[in-house]
UniProtKB/Swiss-Prot annotation:
The protein's name in its UniProt record: Protocadherin gamma-C5
Lineage: Eukaryota, Metazoa, Chordata, Craniata, Vertebrata
Calcium listed as a keyword: yes
A single MF term (Gene Ontology): calcium ion binding
Record's keyword annotation contains Signal: yes
Gene field: PCDHGC5
Source organism (scientific name): Homo sapiens (Human)
UniProt-listed CDD domains: Cadherin_repeat (cd11304)
Region of interest: Disordered: 722-747, 812-853, 914-944
Length: 944
């Protein structure tokens, strides 16, 4: 077994020709092997991989395989070794019949590249059949008048084997009357004849028994026998004869049933019954022939009985005989050879040998994606087949020997066309031509060549504040024209930050469907808008991605009630405001100031009086500004204390509200005698006699207290030397500082606006270690003004004395928020006659050393004048009115700042970085003295 090579050429071209022929055989796929029939399954036929020159390491990648299931019926091909082996026992006789050559075509397909190799396996005959006769016994009638040398044809033995394994010769049992003669027919088969060697004598022996043996040429030889009984008849010495022993006739396939093939004509010179002939098929006529043809015994006409198919058999052989009616009857024989003519009655067939399905859309142009075989069972021009492909497809057909290749002719795009319906048309060259269609569906597999794309470049979402976490904001959607994993999208939040925190801590996106949820509860007052970057990524390899922007707008909700800035919410602990009974209608009493942290309509504030007020008809409140004014003139029977309750309501839905309570004390002072803020700031106060008396008294007492002041001064100096500048509670005179000191100072003026100006404090905080604190006190009941030079402030201990802008210092030397500011000292009021000046009328023991430096005094008055004149200006934007010195809050209802400084009643000088403090300690809360001008000095308790 093994591949057969072509004849070798001589000379120096021998090697070159052999290599060329081998290469041609591999390219065209021609290999030939042989195997003996009836070989056991697993018998090696040949190694295809070795004969093709394939390496063992390439077998797995080349995927060596049989081309069709029909080949796999008889043979198997090992993918690991490339060995072609017998799959089941092969019976040559049932496969090829009496044909001398039995070839089985086998198709082998390899991949990478895709190739088709044609292999022919010759099935070698095995002497596995013995010769056999049609019948085990035959009776022959021979007339006694038969002459010596007469020949009588015997039945030939049939042996399905071929070649040397078929019938080789015959032998006859020994007999004195008969001998055996063997002739060779045209097809090479031996034909036995019984020869009469001597005259028969019926009276001597009426019956002769002969044994005919047929022996084949196999090794070992096989044989078969039949018993011949010769009956000697009376004379009928002429046998029928045909005009020719072999007759040849042709008939087209598909001839209609009943078609006359030919009419036999035999002659017998005898007369009577010995010359009357009957026709019949000979014993060697096969059953298949008997089914296709019929013989009329009387006329000898042969007609078609069944379908004649050229593809089934191209040749038929009919054995006919003519028998007379003599006694004994004699017969003659002839052979009719029938040639079947081809008709184009078979459409061509397209057989799919291999198909790469699906095909990657990235497959290069010219790649083989399928192999096809075509065949037509007709012959000649009727069997010539051409294969065409449907137009307008990115594929083409390339013919090769015995097969066609399907190649790509254009680039493929799955997103444009996911599959192709390919129709292959096979046509033969017959007339008329026959066609056969083969339709295949070729799928195009996806490659990740498309990035996902969001449906919108910008998404906008709105959410009300205070919504619980998990609230749905919106849904982002992206699409990917790819399929499978290449189109499976995953959404995520790209790592940007919002207010210094990761964006993922604010929102969460469902990675599968793109729904975006809130991660937390949003507060409009803290955050109005988020800018989020949402990304999407497919699951291809490598993955592709895209981004989009999401703007989340937080909508305001009316969740903040108005906050009252003035008057203070803790009105029960606040000092009441003074209102003279002589105030005319429309006089400004106070101004209620409130803010709302919400926005828009939710922050629009309106003011109204509540019935809880003591005298609701006495006062009016402006709906939009919050100004409280007298509605009528004050009467004598009006209560001395009035409580005005103002309702502050926002414009939200539902509306929220707060209340402000203003305490008023009605006084009998003449408004003409009430001091105005501009009076004591612009005109220097006139010294009354009472003030002069006080100065003289203080000068007298000062000598007695000199020792005490000296001791206190030494103690203060010692405290400054120890670095505790803020711990001493003494006041001393300070030399005039340099001009640079005031350039570096940050003055802070605090004015109380609860009806009348009661006290002012100025704090200078230079960058050096010393600070100065001045305070002036005015009382409506006194004719003088008290000015106290409190103490120097040291900044060496910031934890004790350095005050931040948002805090004030209490008497207990602790810091507190401005919202906790203590009420002003009610004793610090001034009378009509009292005016501030460059020197006070208070006792030096109570107020400390008064600044006598002209520069210090002028600077202090300038700062007081600048602040007080703005507060007293009736046309100021802050508002103004009698009795209030025109002071009002800086923020009205129209402002919606989120963090409004809770300055309460304080007014600040721009540029100051500190809050005015009462460094001297707790204010004196006692009521002022009577009209005799005597009042309790605040400086006394400050020096305890």
């Amino acid at each position: 077994m093994g591949p057969k090579t072509l004849p070798q050429l001589a000379g120096k071209w021998q090697v070159l020709c052999m290599l060329s022929l081998c290469c041609w055989g591999w390219v065209s796929g021609q290999l030939r092997y042989s195997v003996v029939e009836e070989s056991e399954p697993g018998t090696l036929v040949g190694n295809v991989a070795q004969d093709l020159g394939l390496k063992m390491t390439d077998l797995l990648s080349r995927r060596l395989q049989l081309g069709s299931e029909e080949n796999g019926r008889y043979f198997s091909l090992s993918l690991m070794s490339g060995a072609l082996a017998v799959n089941q026992k092969i019976d040559r006789e049932s496969l090829c019949g009496a044909s001398t050559s039995c070839l089985l075509p086998v198709q082998v397909v390899t991949e990478h590249p895709l190739e088709l190799i044609r292999v022919e396996v010759e099935i070698l005959d095995l002497n596995d059949n013995s010769p056999s006769f049609a019948t085990p016994e035959r009776e022959m009638r021979i007339s006694e008048s038969a002459a010596s040398g007469a020949r009588f044809p015997l039945d030939s033995a049939q042996d399905p084997d071929v070649g040397t394994n078929t019938v080789s010769f015959y032998t006859l049992s020994p007999n004195s009357h008969f001998s055996l003669n063997v002739k060779t027919l045209k097809d090479g088969k031996p034909f036995p004849e019984l020869v009469l060697e001597q005259q028969l004598d019926r009276e001597a022996q009426a019956r002769h028994q002969l044994v005919l043996t047929a022996v084949d040429g196999g090794t070992p030889a096989r044989s078969g026998t039949t018993l011949i009984s010769v009956i000697v008849l009376d004379i009928n010495d002429n046998a029928p004869t045909f005009q020719s022993s072999v007759l040849r006739v042709g008939i087209p396939e598909n001839a209609p049933i009943g078609t006359l093939l030919l009419r036999l004509n035999a002659t017998d010179p005898d007369e009577g019954t010995n010359g009357q002939l009957d026709y019949s098929f000979g014993d060697h006529t096969s059953e298949a022939v008997r089914n296709l043809f019929g013989l009329d015994p009387s006329s000898g006409a042969i007609h078609v009985l069944g379908p004649i198919d050229f593809e089934e058999s191209r040749f038929y052989e009919i054995h006919a005989r003519a028998r007379d009616q003599g006694q004994p009857a004699m017969e003659g024989h002839c052979v009719i050879q029938v040639d079947v003519g081809d008709v184009n009655d078979n459409a061509p067939e397209v057989l799919l040998a291999s198909l790469a399905n699906p095909v990657l859309e990235s497959t290069p142009v010219g790649t083989v994606v399928g192999l096809f075989n075509v065949r037509d069972r007709d012959s000649g021009r009727n069997g010539e087949v051409s294969l065409d492909i449907s137009p307008d497809l990115p594929f083409q057909i390339k013919p090769s020997e015995n097969h066609y290749s399907l190649l790509t002719s254009q680039p493929l795009d799955r997103e444009a066309t996911s599959h192709y319906i390919i129709e292959l048309l096979a046509s033969d060259a017959g007339s008329p031509s026959l066609h056969k269609h083969l339709t295949i569906r070729l799928n195009i597999s996806d490659v990740n060549d498309n990035a996902p794309r969001f449906n919108q470049q910008l998404y906008t979402a709105y959410i009300l504040e205070n919504r619980p976490p998990g609230s749905l904001l919106c849904t982002v959607a992206a699409s990917d024209p790819d399929t499978g994993d290449n189109a499976r999208l995953t959404y995520s939040i790209v790592g940007n930050q919002v207010q210094g925190a990761p964006a993922s801590s604010f929102v969460y996106v469902n990675p599968e469907d793109g729904r975006i949820f809130a991660q937390r509860t949003f507060d409009y007052e803290l955050l109005q808008m988020l800018q989020i970057v949402v990304g999407v990524r497919d699951s291809g390899s490598p993955p592709l991605h895209a981004n989009t922007s999401l703007h989340v707008f937080v909508l305001d909700e009316n969740d903040n009630a108005p906050a009252v800035l003035h008057p203070r919410p803790d009105w029960e602990h606040s000092a009441p405001q003074r209102l003279p009974r002589s105030a005319p209608p429309g006089s400004l009493v106070t101004k209620v100031t409130a803010v709302d942290a919400d926005a828009g309509h939710n922050a629009w504030l309106s003011y109204s009086l509540l019935p809880q007020s003591t005298a609701p008809g006495l006062f009016l409140v402006s709906t939009h500004t919050g100004e409280v004014r007298t509605a009528r003139a004050l009467l004598e029977d009006d209560s001395d204390t009035q409580q005005v309750v103002v309702l502050v309501r926002d414009n939200g839905d539902p509306s929220l509200s707060s209340t402000a309570t203003v305490l008023l004390v009605l006084e009998d002072e003449d408004p003409e005698e009430m001091p105005k803020s501009s009076d004591f700031l612009i005109h220097p106060p006139e010294r009354s006699d009472l003030t002069l008396y006080l100065i003289v008294a203080l000068a007298t007492v000062s000598l007695l207290s000199l020792v005490t002041f000296t001791f206190l001064s030494a103690k203060c100096l010692q405290g400054n030397a120890d670095g505790d500048g803020g711990g001493g509670q003494c006041c001393r005179r300070q030399d005039s500082p340099s001009p640079d000191f005031y350039k570096q100072s940050s003055p802070n003026l605090q004015v109380s606006s609860d009806g009348t100006l009661k006290y002012m404090e100025v704090t200078l905080r230079p960058t050096d270690s010393q600070s100065h604190c001045y305070r002036t006190c005015f009382s409506p009941a006194s004719d003088g003004s008290d000015f106290t030079f409190l103490r120097p402030l040291s900044v060496q201990q910031p934890t004790a004395l350095a005050l931040e802008p948002d805090a004030i210092r209490s008497r207990s030397n602790t810091l507190r928020e401005r919202s906790q500011q203590a009420p002003p000292n009610t004793d610090w009021r001034f009378s009509q006659a009292q005016r501030p000046g460059t020197s006070g009328s208070q006792n030096g023991d109570d107020t400390g050393t008064w600044p006598n430096n002209q520069f210090d005094t002028e600077m202090l008055q300038a700062m007081i004048l600048a602040s007080a004149s703005e507060a007293a200006d009736g046309s100021s934007t802050l508002g103004g009115g009698a009795g209030t010195m025109g002071l009002s809050a800086r923020y009205g209802p129209q402002f919606t700042l989120q963090h409004v400084p809770d300055y309460r009643q304080n007014v600040y000088i721009p540029g100051s970085n500190a809050t005015l403090t009462n460094a001297a300690g707790k204010r004196d809360g006692k009521a002022p003295a009577g009209g005799n001008g005597n009042k309790k000095k605040s400086g006394k308790k400050e020096k305890k």
